Regions:
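Structural beta-alpha unit
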Residues: 1-3, 16, 30, 76-112, ...
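Small/aliphatic-rich secondary-structure junction motif
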Residues: 2-55, 135, 145, 160-164
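Short, well-ordered secondary-structure micro-motifs
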Residues: 20, 47-50, 99-102, 123, ...
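General small-molecule cofactor/ligand-binding pocket signal
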Residues: 36-38, 88-92, 141
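A short acidic, glycine-rich active-site loop
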Residues: 55-70
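Glycine-rich, Arg-bearing micro-motifs that act as flexible, cationic patches
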Residues: 109-131, 149-153
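Short, structured coil segments at secondary-structure junctions
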Residues: 128, 136-137
Length: 164
């Protein structure tokens, strides 16, 4: 029998990805599924490795190790709340949307936040969550962050929407 596909969580260190991780871990606990937390990176987004010094650019492996350590530290407090959930980590070098879509091929569901650390480039290229909804190989859950992603006054009573 094959192992169940994991819940894949995209995590970039933002408060939005923390909300997504919490929801993904809760869902994993309820469904009895494992979790894989993915953080993609580039040299410009990676934390500075311990081997960095002025005038010396460390090898890519050192950046990869720094990203993996930062991810583990970022999610450690949350994982302590879900000790019964099996969690693995993946830190590929590449664009977030592309890497999450690739990883979604072996996932039950992909969980992402509404926004991340993308900044202005994300506005120009489209958000990672939009890319995932459009192209992921599995279902995608986009998690709203309480108090931030709320849009008061935008809902209409059902009967108002049915009027001619």
């Amino acid at each position: 029998m094959n192992a169940p596909a994991p819940i894949l969580i995209g995590h970039d260190g933002s408060k939005f990805s923390r909300a997504a991780a919490r929801r993904g871990l809760s869902l994993a606990r309820a469904l009895g599924l494992p979790v894989r937390i993915l953080r993609s990176w580039s040299i410009s987004t990676a934390p500075r490795p311990a081997t960095w010094s002025p005038g010396f650019v460390p090898p890519r492996e050192d950046f990869a190790a720094a990203v993996a350590e930062a991810l583990r530290q970022d999610v450690a407090p949350l994982l302590a709340e879900y000790p019964d959930v099996q969690v693995t980590f993946e830190t590929p070098h590449g664009a977030a949307g592309r890497e999450l879509i690739r990883a979604s091929e072996q996932a039950e569901v992909l969980v992402v936040g509404t926004r991340g650390l993308g900044g202005f480039a994300g506005l120009l290229l489209g958000s990672v969550s939009d890319q995932c909804v459009e192209h992921a190989a599995c279902d995608v859950l986009v998690v709203r962050t309480p108090g931030i992603d709320q849009a008061p006054g935008r809902t209409l009573p059902l009967d108002a929407t049915l009027e001619g």
